[in-house]
């Protein structure tokens, strides 16, 4: 891994032994003080966050009971279990709908054809690690007072949906695509649990990230982002096709045309000028203008080699703390890059002022 600047802390946030606590959305009002995992040193394991309800895989029988339409896509595996064809976009979307209904109390969820269909276990993992980051060992935060900014929410709105239902967080979700935001608005309209907790904002300047979205006097405990990591549409299409080929390698099948790709995603969901490195550089540069309005800035970083330029850019700013949190999800390794302009003492004052009784 690239060597981080002196103030950087690298955390291998892997699941320690122990059973995660499961929680149902109907109990959301009782889960204001979500317990956090303060143990961040452990040998890397192929496991989700210990609080992730998906840590033991999918209970397809329970999911089918919650959303019967899933039954049409479920097949027995050679190992004696049940699964779906993850290269089939309709199957994956139906699985997501069932997961959201069964585990998170979301009665309606849909995405336009070709839009990015996110893997829910990995998405909610990001949120659990952010809860740990925010708490910094304080087990008594009032979580439903937390405000979060989601940059590039897409048509699926998955991070705000999960964050509202798991933690009771309040969200502002931005995107440069008005069609994507309209789809998320439709999801909000049909899920009363999201009413008053999720606000949408159109980013009118495609070259900006925080500017034009964060308003004067507005305060966020966290910002989060899953940045587009390709530099062109052609590169994005090839990357998605490669994923499908890998999935189908052991099935003796031929990958479908790009239009049929489960991994989907269009425009800003998958690519931007300069790809992930340029997007992260812009985000870091803009963050200094909102240093006093956001406690923690965070973003996923898909490629390890993109960390070094981020560290270099952050070292030039008046950043107090930088953390890199490694997440292991099956055979996939991804990272959360987090930085704060506030000292540990100031972060504690912030938490006491805004997130405590």
Curated annotation (Swiss-Prot):
GO-annotated molecular function: 23S rRNA (adenine(1618)-N(6))-methyltransferase activity
Annotated Gene Ontology cellular component terms: cytoplasm
Location within or outside the cell: Cytoplasm
Assigned keywords, A-Z: Cytoplasm, Methyltransferase, rRNA processing, S-adenosyl-L-methionine, Transferase
Superkingdom, taxonomy of origin: Bacteria
InterPro entries with a match to the protein in the record: METTL16/RlmF (IPR010286), rRNA_lsu_MeTfrase_F (IPR016909), SAM-dependent_MTases_sf (IPR029063)
GO annotation, biological process: rRNA base methylation
UniProt xrefs under NCBIfam families: PRK11727.1
Protein name per Swiss-Prot or TrEMBL: Ribosomal RNA large subunit methyltransferase F
Source taxonomy: Bacteria, Pseudomonadati, Pseudomonadota, Gammaproteobacteria, Alteromonadales
Gene label: rlmF
